[in-house]
Amino acid sequence: MMEEGRKEEPEERGEKSTMRDLLQRAVDKGHLTAREALDRWTLEDHGEIHPWIILFCFAGAIGVIGGWGLRGELNVCMLIVLVVLVPIYWGIGEAARNIDSLDWKWIRKVFIVIIFVLVGLLGGCSAQRQHVAMLLSPPGIRLPSTVDIPWFCISNAPIPDCVHWTVQKPDQKHQQIENVMELQEVLDNATFFEVPDLFDRVYLELARLDANSTGVPVNIPPTGISQVKGDCSTGDIQGMNETLSTRGTLGERTFLSIRPGGWFTNTTVWFCVHWPFGFIQRKENLSEGSAQVRNCLDPINVTEPRVANYSYCPLEYKGKNYINKGLKCVGGRVDLSSNPEQHTDLLACGTFCQNFRNCDMVSRDILIGYHPSQQKQHIYINHTFWEQANTQWILVQVPNYGFVPVPDTERPWKGGKPRGKRAVGMVIFLLVLAIMAMTASVTAAATLVKQHATAQVVGRLSTNLTYITKIQNQYLHLFQNLNTRVNNLHHRVTYLEFLAEVHEVQTGLGCVPRGRYCHFDWRPEEVGLNMTLWNSTTWQQWMSYYDQIEENIWNLKYNWSEALEKGKSNTDGLEPDVFRYLADLSSSFTWGSWVDKLVWLAYILLAYFAFKVLQCIMSNLGAQTRYQLLNAQEDTDPAGDGDQPDDHRSGDTPRSGVPSGGWSQKLSEGKKIGCLILRTEWQNWRNDLRTLRWLTLGGKILQLPLSLLVLLVRILLHILSPTFQNQRGWTVGRKGTGGDDRELSPELEYLSWTGSSQEMVEMRDLKEEDIPEEGIRPVEM
């Protein structure tokens, strides 16, 4: 193959040199003009690529790469465009080799228009902005920053599953929280963490639900001392959660320490709630008789009511801090065995521990302040409040949806197949049928047993009554179990109703009730979303903040709809034209649209050529009016000697400006040239197919439409070139009747006289020495 390629190169060079010699010989002999020889050489594919073509190719490639950079992603469509541009640019480059400088007058205009369109499109691309998105189901809170939120757990179950909290040590829990925080820092674009789905409407029933269905709260074991620091008002309460265990008849249960930032955990239903209460005053800021407890949701004022059972443990006394001393509560009092040197100080202020039912607790877990001026009057918590805290589990409402800023390039998450509706009504109906069937069966069994006992001896009546009592007990136990299951079903249905309300709100805002985000067209500052307030607001304030943002979005949508209706009423009747224009604009980069543009371009070219033809015809008609035929009297010799010029015959008037004879010959020559060019191109195609030159053949296939257009332009220019010169006042004709019929080159063309016949006779009779040096000046049109 290499040898064949080397052989082909000299052959091609020889063909080029032979073609050049033949054209030069034809020009020397006068068979071809210089213009025709140049056209023949150009049509033989020996041209070069024009710089405008190279600039256009580079502009298109830079536009594609620039669009890629603005979007920030490389999709399949962009790859297809890059791959398709290579053969297109190749074909344009190959077609440019056959275009001379005269044909670039209209091609340059097309390129300039295309470049302006590309510049306008690139200039219209806006920078990336942010818009507001609503977090959709599953309900939860997104961690927008690395703030230490005091509670969260990761779960995928419909009911929160916090099992991993019960089997880990405190250090492991904190390590897990840190790992999640680090993961959140790595991710971006609204990373979503699912938190416990705390029910909004179920307050007491689900929290107190237990295996024995008695509703009696489980006693809390001793908690010891927790190291607590921070302030609940800013959400910075931190500390070590202590895992505690107790065994009883109901199985093993695990609880976290009761303190600000701690948790209650009931392993029966695996339900996590937050204990948010704690004193927020410090020793320096306390005033006598006033103290405030805050739960990070709502402040609670605590006074000094009369109580029967209370005690305290100071956080700080006489400038000494006892927080990190490891004190324990033994027998209702503080164990001072580990700190004997401070025994006196603690006894001076009272070393009692809070009596919480039958379980002792160190009150330091609740952050009790101490007033230094009056040692006998201490700040304590209302006993009724303690009973309420022990009886009812306190639930923290978790926002089921929120608003976050996301970039404009973020695409909505396309969810999978939606989950089917649960047949809750069918389950309830089946339960009712089961209850009725079981009731009927139990009643029938009791009746049969009673009839059988009556038919038997009277002595077995007591045994039958015993059997009936057992059946009634079993029936009662069955209804207790059914009650428990119906309660569970009630909680699930209540939660689904709440989710339905949330989805209704989301649907009203134009959101799909599934997926990850619901994208809006407004920026965060337009709806009033400020994520910097996260660390300085409580949960209740944050929920009201969400309500305000939701109201702002409703107002924006309402204003937008009103503006749309107003604009629609103002532009009534113009919508179809606007939509049609937008549709045409959106389809401006499709192949079909460019074909339409080429058709219009062909129409414009045909109109231009028709205009030129009419202009040439008018010019020829104007030139024809300047001719005057000589009659018999004017043909005679002015001197009366009867001699006539030898080279002037009665039928040979210089009427070469008339287009009838010249145009037919031009048309035949143009037809011959076109056939010659097409025959040459077909021979080249056959050679490429025979030698399997697929690269050259592919370029020629791509440049075929443009080559045909260029061929048409060349034929028209060849036909109309004499007419263009007629517009300047000259008429192109033949050298004479006695000479050959070939057309001379443009440098040696014979110029016909456009004056009167009398002037022509006078000029003919002049001798060569009488002709002025500057020659005969033609008459300007």
From Swiss-Prot:
GO cellular component, one term: virion membrane
GO molecular function: structural molecule activity
Keywords from the UniProt entry: Cleavage on pair of basic residues, Coiled coil, Disulfide bond, Glycoprotein, Host cell membrane, Host membrane, Host-virus interaction, Membrane, Transmembrane, Transmembrane helix, Viral attachment to host cell, Viral envelope protein, Virion, Virus entry into host cell
Region (Fusion peptide): 423-443
InterPro entries the UniProt entry points to: GP41-like
Subunit structure: The mature envelope protein (Env) consists of a trimer of SU-TM heterodimers attached by non-covalent interactions or by a labile interchain disulfide bond.
Protein name: Envelope glycoprotein
Organism, as annotated: Jembrana disease virus (JDV)
Gene: env
